[in-house]
Design a protein with these regions (language model features):
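Short aromatic-acidic-glycine turn motif
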Residues: 96-110
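Catalytic cores of secreted or luminal carbohydrate-active enzymes
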Residues: 188-234
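Acidic-aromatic substrate-binding/catalytic surfaces of carbohydrate-active enzymes
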Residues: 1-51, 112, 116-117, 124-179
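Extended, loop-rich substrate-binding clefts of extracytoplasmic carbohydrate-active enzymes
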Residues: 13-75, 81-83, 87, 168-194, ...
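Short, hydrophobic/aromatic beta-strand segments
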Residues: 82-92, 219-220
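Short acidic, flexible loop segments centered on an aromatic residue
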Residues: 89-100, 176-181, 224
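Extracellular beta-rich ligand/substrate-recognition surface
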Residues: 51-57, 106-108, 118-121, 131, ...
Length: 238
């Protein structure tokens, strides 16, 4: 998976245009694999300028992996270094985990693989990642900074073949206005599509946080500990 167009956790997809323009321009760090520029950043486990991996993108994009109170945070900082307003109408973070069951027997799949369950609830949204065998901790991906879970978009450009045992990968979509005006046009959206406008010299950070629930049954309690709203259905409710 180290070739062009294969997505990894840490990639980013950005769709933008000059404010007032008509056509959206797409950029993805998966399109062509090139070296990123490491950055010195004391508060990060690793930091890099990703602009080179995004082709001719007019904005500066930096990525930070951080430890926040024992949790892993993936943050992207986008800065407008031009003299023009730019509107970011598509912003997605690929959620790449091992959900490919191809060529595996039941025992191997249960040992190696996971399945996802997204809740696209904006700032209350989250993605849970559980092992197929159902044991051990569950991974929860949560909004951390300006990263409401607005949509869950299939990454159809990833070359990994789809099959009855592999549904493909998806991205956590923070802004979906560009999608709603192009490939999703005419389709009712679960959440109102949004965008962000960056003025010259302005920057904005977007981050998700990865936390562990002790086990699947503790997911709701972990969400409460993370100060997230939780609704639990009980027998007989309507």
């Amino acid at each position: 998976r180290d070739r062009d167009k294969f997505f990894h956790l840490g990639d980013v997809n950005i769709t933008l245009k000059k404010e007032g323009a008509t056509d959206w321009q797409k950029y993805s760090s998966s399109t062509k694999r090139v070296d990123v520029k490491p950055l010195a950043h004391k508060k990060s486990l690793a930091a890099a300028n990703m602009s080179a991996a995004l082709g001719d993108i007019p904005l500066e994009v930096n990525r930070y992996w951080q430890n926040v109170n024992g949790d892993l945070v993936l943050k992207f900082e986008i800065k407008n270094t031009t003299q023009t307003n730019y509107e970011i109408g598509g912003l997605g973070i690929p959620m790449i985990f091992n959900n490919n069951l191809d060529w595996k027997n039941l025992d191997t799949a249960h040992m190696d693989n996971v399945f996802f369950d997204p809740y696209i609830g904006k700032d209350a949204g989250y993605l849970q990642v559980n092992r197929l065998h159902g044991n051990g901790p569950s991974l929860l991906v949560l909004p951390h900074e300006n990263a409401g879970f607005e949509a869950y978009n299939p990454l159809n450009s990833d070359p990994t073949p789809r099959s009855i045992t592999f549904e493909g990968f998806h991205e956590w979509v923070i802004h979906s206005k560009a999608y709603a005006e192009t490939e999703w046009k005419g389709v009712e959206q679960w959440n109102t599509p949004t965008s962000t406008v960056l003025k010259p010299g302005e920057s904005k950070s977007f981050a998700v946080r990865m936390v562990l629930a002790p086990n699947i049954k503790e997911i709701e309690n972990e969400l409460i500990r993370q100060q997230r709203p939780v609704a639990v259905g009980v027998s007989g409710y309507i």
